[in-house]
Amino acid sequence: MGNYKSRPTQTCTDEWKKKVSESYVITIERLEDDLKIKEKELTELRNIFGSDEAFSKVNLNYHTENGLSLLHLCCICGGNKSHIRTLMLKGLRPSRLTRNGFTALHLAVYKDNAELITSLLHGGADIQQVGYGGLTALHIATIAGHLEAADVLLQHGANVNIQDAVFFTPLHIAAYYGHEQVTRLLLKFGADVNVSGEVGDRPLHLASAKGFLNIAKLLMEEGSKADVNAQDNEDHVPLHFCSRFGHHDIVKYLLQNDLEVQPHVVNIYGDTPLHLACYNGKFEVAKEIIQISGTESLTKENIFSETAFHSACTYGKSIDLVKFLLDQNVININHQGRDGHTGLHSACYHGHIHLVQFLLDNGADMNLVACDPSRSSGEKDEQTCLMWAYEKGHDAIVTLLKHYKRPQDELPCNEYSQPGGDGSYVSVPSPLGKIKSMTKEKADILLLRAGLPSHFHLQLSEIEFHEIIGSGSFGKVYKGRCRNKIVAIKRYRANTYCSKSDVDMFCREVSILCQLNHPCVIQFVGACLNDPSQFAIVTQYISGGSLFSLLHEQKRILDLQSKLIIAVDVARGMEYLHNLTQPIIHRDLNRSLKYLSAFCCCPNHLFLTAHTIYLLAP
């Protein structure tokens, strides 16, 4: 049994295929590099290949800095079959490689020039000669998707099943890149559909992973039928790959066409195709597998003690998928894997707070414990989902679990002990949570400094503080002077509480206020950003005070016209906020947050803080 917490997100096959993909990208880059000729040199070469007289006088030993001979250049710069024949008769070797590792035949194939390919082959070029990466000319034609070039090579006896340095045949490459017509041609010339690559991958594995349905169908045709249940070195079958990457049409084709697919087969990690669909949030694929093949896969656990339900909770971004799996009435929401961990453990460990809330609302038991399988049998290390969240620094989830703590539990609501442990308590911020918060805050501040226009950057030395005119949990508000203007200064305390810090609110508030410009919204003057201990937001000072002060402290009586002026100005400010490209909702519109320039005189101003603003997507 494997340790869930050490479950790899990438398999060995994934790592290998990434390297294979990179190698083919490099191959194309090297081919393109060979095709790059300096403009002056290119003009001269075109003149040579465009004139029989000039060509007859050319130095046969000529070559470029990249090691391109005249034979290579003939394939790039407008040469013809006559030039090829002449150069080869005069002794230029077609086997010579450029510094990037390609013959003239490779370059002619990459340029898709059937005439030059034929001429080179008739002149004695080795059709099976390998260049960079163990690639033959047929491999190059397949990578580029050049149907005509591939056809000429096959007509002249190219080995259709030859393998390159990563043991890919041309058919592997055609399936990988989705070259349907080239695939059809290769099959016509007898390509082996079941030959294995370096990690046991067949062309059908590649087509299934990349989502090429038509190629998958070609590979399954009678006469060259691929083994639909063939396993690679990690026991993946094609259904594993199309399920993992969400290729619903291929999943449906494999399951519905009497192909004798084994839908519940497992890889070396114990994953069924349904597991992989759920680990990657492929809801439609998961539904298709269950609807066609039944619910057998739902009860299977992989080596990390996870059912498909656990897998969906590990992914955590599709509550609809989790709900669908629970609706099958096969797995209980509190089902524990062999190591004891539940879907709630998985969601907590990966920080999926919305899923955690959904599971708790639907009866998930936060007191169930998991055991660490890496410990020896004599040691008992039982952990609740809260401990898993705490370990990963997901402090918001720890706080949420506090809210949902069962009333019969005797521990205080703000402290937790580990069941079966030594009674030690956990509290937020967790060590990792604190590090995450600090790292995020530093990044947020740097981004804010970079994005805030320079005229909004203030130094604390530029500000003259006068009397205090307000206070709150964030700090204090002062009346003062800045750049020869009377202003209001909101001075922050640089402390962190719970899971949301003043730094976060400060950055949020500044980033929004700096974009606002309307006569009925308090004007932003600037901010001090140098250090959290000096954080301050400077805004326009409104001399008339708040509407609350006017009505309840000064006991002023407003006439109807003044009330209408105030109401209209507030509405104008709200309309401006709501009609921004990214609309803003003022979530706490009350008398304390409406300020008056002077008694009964417009404009009246809306005051926004990080607590009262809410951004809507455009």
UniProtKB/Swiss-Prot annotation:
SUPFAM superfamilies the record matches: Ankyrin repeat, Protein kinase-like (PK-like)
Domain Protein kinase: 463-618
Listed EC numbers: 2.7.11.1
Residue stretches of each ANK repeat: 66-96, 100-129, 133-162, 166-195, 199-228, 234-263, 269-298, 304-335, 339-368, 381-410
GO cellular component terms, semicolon-separated: cytoplasm; nucleus
Primary localization: nucleus
Protein name: Serine/threonine-protein kinase TNNI3K
Gene of this entry: TNNI3K
Lineage, top ranks: Eukaryota, Metazoa, Chordata, Craniata, Vertebrata
Oligomeric and partner information: Interacts with TNNI3, ACTC, ACTA1, MYBPC3, AIP, FABP3 and HADHB.
Pfam families, per database record: Ank, Ank_2, PK_Tyr_Ser-Thr
Xref: SMART domains: ANK (SM00248)
